[in-house]
Each structure stands twice: as structure tokens, then as C-alpha cells.
């Protein structure tokens, strides 16, 4: 939800390219990366991973459904991507989540399930 967070006055920090690079390294081997965003233009200009597929033109519900069907999930600090990962029924999924969810130093230990990577 990058587009939403550009106007949030720091309530939710925007994840860095380095966060996504580290997350892809944790996932390891993959056939392709599906990119879901409300700021696809920025993603196309700034994310440089092999085999990217930019998902465009869907409703939010369609995106949520597609995200929940992915083999793994790299999520932002958003409830939208959190729910997509939570609803993913792949028993062997790897979920990578940002450690910092809010601009203020708040306790977020109860947000991320223990089996998810928190970087």
C-alpha cells in the first residue's frame, strides 16, 4: 500500500528497496515474483528482480485472493498484505514481514506470527 503511506505523515514507514532485497534472499529460489501494489509505476521503476510479473487491473478483492494463493508472501506493513499472507493455506509458505510497522516506537510483537520472518 505504498501509495497510501506516502500521505500518512509517517504513521506507517514506507519499506525500502533493501527490505525487499533481503526478503527475496530469504525466500530463496523462485520461478517468478508477482508484484501487487497501488503504486505499480514506482515498482516498475525501482524494483529490479529477475522474472517479475506486475499484477494490474484487478479489484482489491481480486488482488487479496491472488496474493493468498501465492507460494510465499513478502508483505509490507499493511493489514491488506498481512491478511493475504494469513489467508494463504500453503503449509510450506514462507512469509517475510517488516519488523517496523508504525512510525512511532510501539510494541508490535503480537502482530506477526512466530513462524513468519520478521526483518
Residue ranges and their predicted role:
Residues 103-119:
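Leloir-type glycosyltransferase catalytic cores
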Residues 1-60, 91:
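Core catalytic architecture of nucleotide-activated donor-dependent transferases building glycoconjugates
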Residues 56-58, 99, 115:
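Residues at the C-termini of beta-strands that transition into short coil/loop
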Residues 8, 13, 23, 37, ...:
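Generic serine detector
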Residues 60-107:
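A donor-sugar binding/catalytic signature common to diverse glycosyltransferases
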